Structures are given as structure tokens and as C-alpha cells.
């Protein structure tokens, strides 16, 4: 294959990915400006995994319910994504462990959105306690 062709495909993929991210972030900011129900804002904290958690932490200053879910989303998904990336470098076992971590991420993602929609302040194991401890002070 031609290196030029490979680099063109790679650049187009990254441009598409960056454009998609910017549209999604813009969409989230506009949704927050609409004055949504706090349960829906809690769900949106989990929508883009740790990215939406960080966005809601930066934009929401008052509501403890939303800040808790945003912090929990940010800490949980960023940590698990980093762990999955690091573990995947281990031959054979790393692939299995990384797959299991990614399955756990999807399960926590669904549970987090359901609990937030129901208005519950559900704490994930380990990460929920950390979020509970720090969500009030983070960037206030």
C-alpha cells in the first residue's frame, strides 16, 4: 500500500473524529442552556463517558446531584479507560483483561444513566466514594 494513501485515510479519520467530538460537545452545551430536568442532566453526565462528566463539572456549579454524577462519570470512566489501555499492552492476558474492563465500562455506563434518570444518587464501587469525597470542591 502507498504511504501517501494510508496517511490521507488516517488524517481524514482524525478530522472526522474531531468534528464529531466538537458537534457532540456543542450539543451538550446547548442542552444545558435549555434548562433540562435535573434527572436528564444527570443522564447526560454519562452520555459521552468521562468527557461529558468533565463538561458538566465545568459548567454546573450549584446542583450537588448533577455535580456528583458528573464527578462519578469523570473519575470512573477516565480511570477505567486508562487502566484498559495500560493492561492491553500485556500480551494475551492483557487482551482478555482489557475486554473485561470494557464490558464493565458499558455496564456501569448503563447503570449510571438509569440511576441518574430515576433521581438516585447511586455510588459505583470504589469510584463512587471518591466522587462523593471530591465533587463539592472540584473547580468551584
UniProtKB/Swiss-Prot annotation:
Transmembrane segments: 40-60, 70-90, 92-112
GO cellular component term, pick one: plasma membrane
Keyword Chaperone included in the entry's annotation: no
Originating organism: Methanocaldococcus jannaschii (strain ATCC 43067 / DSM 2661 / JAL-1 / JCM 10045 / NBRC 100440) (Methanococcus jannaschii)
Membrane topology: Multi-pass membrane protein
Keyword Membrane in record: yes
Pfam families reported for this sequence: DUF4870
Name of the protein described by the UniProt record: UPF0132 membrane protein MJ1527
InterPro entries: DUF4870
Location within or outside the cell: Cell membrane
Major localization class: membrane
Signal peptide: none
Family per similarity comment: Belongs to the UPF0132 family.
Keyword terms: Cell membrane, Membrane, Transmembrane, Transmembrane helix
